[in-house]
Amino acid sequence: MSLSLGDIKFPDNWDLIPNEKNYIDYVYKESIELEVWRPNNKRDLMAHNNVVSLAKYFWPHVDFNRLVMGGELMVWFFSFDDVLDAGIYTDEKQMDLVKRMDNVFINGTVESDATGPEKMALHLRKKCEVMCGKRRKDTFNRFISSCVQWVDSIIPFNKLRSAQGTSPHLELYSYLRKVNIGAYPCVTLTEVMLDHEIEYYIWSDPKWIKMNEDIAIITTLINDLVSYEKEVNDQAGDLNPLYFLQNQKNIPLPDSYKQVVDLIDFWVKDYQTMEQSLLNEMEFKDSKQRSDMEFILEHLRYLASGSKKWSMQTPRYCSPTSPFIEMRTKPSTPVMNSTKKQKIDHVPSQSFISTPIDLNN
């Protein structure tokens, strides 16, 4: 049976060329120093290279320092989430870890026995606080709030399985997963990276909020598709819609896949409608403000299209037996990150941000 991710269609202006990959080693050294990863551990190194490479797809138009921040966010995401997903801690211990991580972001402090993910979180928080300064305190607060929101979503989402006993309805799953997927911290980190002059009211505009939700759901569904084989093999398919739709509706895999693709197409169209409506209502005071907004919108869309591109090359999900032809690899052949860049017609409105980060201020 062969399915194709080519059935997922995005508008041309969602296409991207991944950023450079030289930041990956830099973030790895940081992660060793912060005790996220173990020195000279091949498994940790492989995990690092897989997950941190996602940043170059999410932020293709930022400079090295900001790309490093994206890599740090990925390290924090995966290392903290994996701890809670592993099933090695009691409910009480998991709640304690969540409370400790919330404290890192809210108060900017860590315990004396801080874990690696907690140290990485504090490290990134300090960078964001410096970059935002006093003038953009609201931006910093949005980033902090989105990170706390994500941390607080992990246990409730994991409880979907045990609380229900069976797979959840797709609507309930999507509602919780759009927070749990981690898209919002990526969006707010993009705002941190950009020294923008966008009007404050935009961030509370219902259209902007709905656009964020649309992209989060699209990204969720893409992640669920590409992780299908891995999750089924790990006995975790009951929280994957590609799997549980087969069981709930008694349909074969191709039909389940078509339903998910149709959902993605629906949310892409909804996003486009919302984006156009938002832009039609906005009155830009100058070209800088217009360029800032275009940059934010580009990188919001890249969360969806970047997820798809990254998934088709990462060893985290690619395998010889993948149901998706684009993700099949030869047995025992590692999938390497491609450095060959594709030609695209869309030229980003703002190719690079290159303002230095001064951590001494």
UniProtKB/Swiss-Prot annotation:
Catalysed reaction, written as an equation: (2E,6E)-farnesyl diphosphate = (2S,3R,6S,9S)-(-)-protoillud-7-ene + diphosphate
Family label: Belongs to the terpene synthase family.
Superkingdom of origin: Eukaryota
One Pfam short name: Terpene_syn_C_2
Chain span(s) of sequence motif NDxxSxxxD/E motif: 223-231
Induction (free text): Expression is detectable but at low levels in vegetatively growing cells and increases during development induced by starvation. Expression is highest during he ultimate stage of mature fruiting body (approximately 24 hours after induction).
EC class: lyase
Protein name from the UniProt record: Terpene synthase 6
GO MF entries: (2S,3R,6S,9S)-(-)-protoillud-7-ene synthase activity; metal ion binding; sesquiterpene synthase activity; terpene synthase activity
Domain-level remarks: Contains several highly conserved motifs that are important for catalytic activity including the aspartate-rich 'DDxx(x)D/E' motif and the 'NDxxSxxxD/E' motif, both of which are involved in complexing metal ions to coordinate the binding of the isoprenyl diphosphate substrate in the active site.
Motif residue range(s): DDxx(x)D/E motif: 81-86
Keyword set, alphabetical order: Lyase, Metal-binding
Entry-linked SUPFAM superfamilies: Terpenoid synthases
Keyword Cell cycle: no
Keyword Transmembrane helix: no
Single Gene Ontology BP annotation: sesquiterpene biosynthetic process
EC number: 4.2.3.160
Protein task: Terpene synthase that converts its substrate farnesyl diphosphate (FPP) into the sesquiterpene (2S,3R,6S,9S)-(-)-protoillud-7-ene.
Name of the gene: TPS6
